[in-house]
């Protein structure tokens, strides 16, 4: 009977070692950071290079739409560039977490700053979204007219930058959740 129970135990799959799970989560953290860097920096570059000139009648009578004409767009560029720079500087800590998955001190530091960067990126994207809403739809009560009918490429490029920024917000939220999950698992293992 002992032989039968031993063979039944041999058929059960063994759970993966704890170190592999942690290392896998650390690699996922690193990849999410790379994606978020791409999203934030592409949003900042797309908005920072956004301008369009509309010529009326002659070359001397022109209307310009540039990102720096609106303070919300300036804040958007600064916020996304700041978050992108932070994510770039956090990569060595993420790599260290891959090498030493049991080090919780760096994970606590990353979860704190990741949460701050979620707020910074969200506020920049929200401010620019409010301006884009008025640019697309206007506001008849205040006599603000829609400019996107005339400045199509300006509005399209700004909308693309907003999409990249909101994608970065989602990636940052995933980073915070991943870090919280990793910290919770480390506490449970002790």
Swiss-Prot record:
Membrane topology label: Multi-pass membrane protein
Bilayer-crossing regions: 25-45, 73-93, 108-128, 158-178
Sites where a glycan is attached: 51, 69
Protein name: Casparian strip membrane protein 1
Classification of source organism: Eukaryota, Viridiplantae, Streptophyta, Embryophyta, Tracheophyta
Membrane among keywords: yes
Species of the source: Pinus taeda
Known partners and oligomeric status: Homodimer and heterodimers.
NCBIfam families: A_tha_TIGR01569
Entry keywords, A to Z: Cell membrane, Cell wall biogenesis/degradation, Glycoprotein, Membrane, Transmembrane, Transmembrane helix
Cytoplasmic-side segments: 1-24, 94-107, 179-190
Pfam family of the protein (one): CASP_dom
Family membership noted in the UniProt record: Belongs to the Casparian strip membrane proteins (CASP) family.
Subcellular location: Cell membrane
BP-aspect Gene Ontology terms: cell wall organization
Domain of life of the native organism: Eukaryota
């Amino acid at each position: 009977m002992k032989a039968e129970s031993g063979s039944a135990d041999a058929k059960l799959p063994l759970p993966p070692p704890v170190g592999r799970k942690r290392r896998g989560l650390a690699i996922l953290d690193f990849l999410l950071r790379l994606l978020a860097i791409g999203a934030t920096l592409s949003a900042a570059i797309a908005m920072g290079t956004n301008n369009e000139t509309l010529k009326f009648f002659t070359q001397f009578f022109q209307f310009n739409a540039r990102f720096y004409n609106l303070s919300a767009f300036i804040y958007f560029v600064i916020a996304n560039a700041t978050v992108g720079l932070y994510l770039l500087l956090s990569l060595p800590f993420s790599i260290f977490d891959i090498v030493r998955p049991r080090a919780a001190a760096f994970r606590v530091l990353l979860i704190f700053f990741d949460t701050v960067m979620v707020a910074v990126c969200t506020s920049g994207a929200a401010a620019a979204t409010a301006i884009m809403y008025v640019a697309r739809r206007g506001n008849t009560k205040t006599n603000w007219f829609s400019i996107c009918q005339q400045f199509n490429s300006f509005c399209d490029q700004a909308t693309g930058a907003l999409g990249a920024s909101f994608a970065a917000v989602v990636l940052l939220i995933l980073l915070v959740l991943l870090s919280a999950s990793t910290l919770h698992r480390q506490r449970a293992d002790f």
